[in-house]
Amino acid sequence: MSEFLPQRDWTVIVGSGMAGLMAAMTLAPQPVLLVTRGALGGETSSAWAQGGIAASLGPDDRAALHVADTLAAGDGLCDEDMVVGIVSSAPAVIDALERAGVRFDRDAGGNYVFGLEAAHSRRRILHAEGDGSGAAIVRALTDAVRRTPSITVLEGTEVRRLLTEDSVIAGLACAGPNGSFLLPASQVILATGGLGGLYDATTNPSGNFGQGIMLAARAGAILADMEFVQFHPTALSSPRRPLALVSEAVRGEGALLLNENGERFMAAVPGAELASRDIVARAIDREILRGGQVFLDARQALGSGFASRFPSIDLLCREAGIDPARELVPVRPAVHYHMGGVATDNKGRSSVRGLWVAGETACTGLHGANRLASNSLLEAAAMGMRAAQDIAGRPAPAARSAAAVSPNATADFSPADLAAVRPIVSRHLGIVRHAAGLAEAIRDLLPLAERNGPASDPAVVALSIAVFAALRRESRGAHFRDDFSQKDAKAMRRRLSLNDVVTVAHEFSSSSLATAGFARSA
């Protein structure tokens, strides 16, 4: 390492999506250092979100209905207390966002305009600037952060490791434009987003491989429910990477899914085009595996009104040479969200002292086995705020000097390289899984994860998904195994440390998946 950044009594926030930005704003006027890999708010899934924020604020809606929809989508694995708490926090979240400068869409009478998305029983999705909601929200929050004197922003800086002393957070090993440095810190909030970049077909920023999960796991944090990876049913099918998302709000306005014969294949399924994402994604995947294409037909439902209702999607379609008002839109599933992550409590605390985690990096139990549409931005904002409030209510930690950082922290860490990992993950950890594929994934990923090379960090995250998936010998929510296609009578969440993951991986590598019996449950 080339230098130490001087010690300050600030809280360090890693990541500048919704969770990180809301945590920073909530902590003000306490000092915050916000560290972000790119530009503030840039290259974040939050900024790319076309959907809005689910909030049961409509005249025909109430929190209990939103809770019921969330529990149904989660397929038996939701933490009901977390669901009730986060859903009930929606009014406070919306108020905080509006005070920060977000302007949600309203009608001529000044009332909120609510959209409908899959598996919601009511129109309860709030948008800002239509299908550009994520960009509008993040833009308002980044402006607010830059206006706040207590927040220092460090852009273009990647955190390579969390440093601990006696299992307590002591600092961060970072790499920036001027080289590597150590950043002493005793309070860290990880909010680095998801892991879609592990897959070839994703709607996430391609560089997002689960950095926060890796950092926390290497620091000793417990992981939860890592097998649950959500595939959005309708990404625009094209050579573009990452794939462009076609929000399910389009289906909420009446667009239909057709196979290449022009047949509506979702009509007989409960919920039809607005069934939960796992069901729709598997149905589309089956059609594609039969050798066909799948199309979204918005011609009758929206027609010439498509561009005004969904300007961002209209532009993406036209860039691909498609006029969605007059033509069918080819779609395919793509990785969109990860329900698992670093296990946290209702205040965002991880199992490592001094480490809080919020947003998609965390696993709170809100989503269970399958996320309900537009609950992610709600959770990110709510848990960013909760983590900040928990830190703000604590006594100031004792200052740690650079000398307190462990001696092995002076080693440089290689930047991540996904080239060796992405093909394995895309082939074996997709929409449909089975024992042989999971065994091959574990066999190929384990040596990569145990080495110190550039593939090691993404391989740690990918191996965790594979091990959790191999241990779950049932199909539930977004996790589907064609060799265990039924759901167990008893729902069980699972929590493992990285040491547990590696131990299980070695067991699987030396024995049959069918007889391996290691399982640590929540």
Curated annotation (Swiss-Prot):
Under the heading InterPro entries, the entry gives: FAD-dep_OxRdtase_2_FAD-bd, FAD/NAD-bd_sf, Fum_R/Succ_DH_flav-like_C_sf, Fum_Rdtase/Succ_DH_flav-like_C, NadB, Succ_DH/fumarate_Rdtase_cat_sf
Which transformation does this protein catalyse, written as a reaction? Answer: L-aspartate + O2 = iminosuccinate + H2O2
So which cofactors does this thing need? FAD
Annotated keywords: Cytoplasm, FAD, Flavoprotein, Nucleotide-binding, Oxidoreductase, Pyridine nucleotide biosynthesis
Disulfide cross-links:
none
Main localization of the protein described in the UniProt heading: cytoplasm
Q: Which PANTHER family match?
A: L-ASPARTATE OXIDASE, L-ASPARTATE OXIDASE, CHLOROPLASTIC
How cofactor binds (record note)? Binds 1 FAD per subunit.
Q: Which residues bind FAD?
A: 16-19, 45-52, 360, 376-377
Q: Does the keyword Flavoprotein apply?
A: yes
Q: What does the UniProt entry say about where the protein is found?
A: Cytoplasm
The record's listing under Pfam families reads: FAD_binding_2, Succ_DH_flav_C
Under Enzyme Commission nomenclature, its number is 1.4.3.16
Instruction: Enumerate the active-site residues.
Output: 277 (proton donor/acceptor)
What is the native source organism of this protein?
Agrobacterium fabrum (strain C58 / ATCC 33970)
Coiled-coil parts of chain: none
Q: Which family does it belong to?
A: Belongs to the FAD-dependent oxidoreductase 2 family. NadB subfamily.
From the Swiss-Prot or TrEMBL record, what is one GO molecular function term?
Answer: nucleotide binding
Its pathway, per UniProt, is: Cofactor biosynthesis; NAD(+) biosynthesis; iminoaspartate from L-aspartate (oxidase route): step 1/1
| Annotated protein name in UniProt | L-aspartate oxidase
- Origin, by domain of life? Bacteria
Reported function: Catalyzes the oxidation of L-aspartate to iminoaspartate, the first step in the de novo biosynthesis of NAD(+).
Name of the gene this protein is made from: nadB
Q: Which GO terms describe its cellular component?
A: cytoplasm
Q: For the site Important in orienting the L-aspartate substrate, which positions are given? A: 117
Q: Name one GO biological process term.
A: 'de novo' NAD biosynthetic process from L-aspartate
